[in-house]
Amino acid sequence: CPYYMTYSGCCAGNSDGWKDNLKPEYYEEFAHYLVDVCKHYKDEYGIEFRTLEPFNEPLTNYWSRNGGQEGCHFDISSQIAFLKVLSPILKESGLNTVISASDESVLSDSYNTFEGYRSAGVLNLIGQWNTHSYYGNNKDRSKIRTLSQESGLRLWMSETGSGGSGISGNLEMAKRLMNDVNYL
């Protein structure tokens, strides 16, 4: 999110990576900002995005002030609150784009976030469940697949990596991809 919407004044994250950085009073403005970007691409280039993902690895502590990459921690309750603001704005935009969430880096976090959304009754606000598969096991993958199937949401593995190089890194990447295909 733009720096002026944050607690820290920095788009790389809060001073404490475990704390939210987007101020709630900017939820509506940030939601309009995201939807305006989608509308711009449709109007200027004829590209309509299938999904809009407002979060990236939101439960992690990677995102800290003056870090090397922009990012923003969102507790599950903050994600839910933001989705409640974003959803009607996106629907009113006239776009066919749906919200995807929540791109957690850890499969168990993805599962817990999904359960949090379900408990809060907000799964109907999203059209696709995104997850990363950097960390976790096949049991976690299967749990996410089952939740997605039960809810009728499209499931999308949107990012992974092996963290290695050479043949060992390549073999690990192949293993992860095969596990994602077979268990997600």
Feature locations, PLM:
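Catalytic-core region of carbohydrate-active enzymes that cleave or remodel glycosidic bonds
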Residues: 127-184
